[in-house]
Amino acid sequence: MTTVSSREQINSAIGTWSGFIYQGLCGILTALKMIEADSAGVAGYKLQLDGYEDFSILDGTDQIVSLHQCKCIKGRTEYAEDLNKMKIKRDSLTNKRPDIKSYFHCNETVAMVEGLEIEPYPFKNGKTKCGPGELKSIIKGLTCKVPCLSYPKIL
């Protein structure tokens, strides 16, 4: 049996890569849910990955609508430090737009910190945790429901 040293585990890209996949799935789900809820109202909105946060939703004038932090770590439910950093980042941006929403996406139920105005993301049917496999299933279901939008023809 081969063992991996703690140094190799720390430097491994496996956790980071799966984190990027989870982040992307959460971004796609969020965008699809917004389109399903109000396709005309979000026309021109943008999904920005790895900008202000793990991902952000920007309106048609590039103003931040919401910030999203994503964590997919098995067994971990305590993220107070990450939540506090997210609040500081949001507070530094609210002078431009005071109504920025903040959401935390996770594969586990997270102990949220009161007073930070960061909400666990509502995935489906009130659930506030969702793993990658279930995310893919929800996304697949939403792609069948989302209305087609008219976009300029690209050559």
Task: Please give the residue ranges for each predicted region.
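Catalytic centers of nucleases
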Residues: 16-17, 23-91
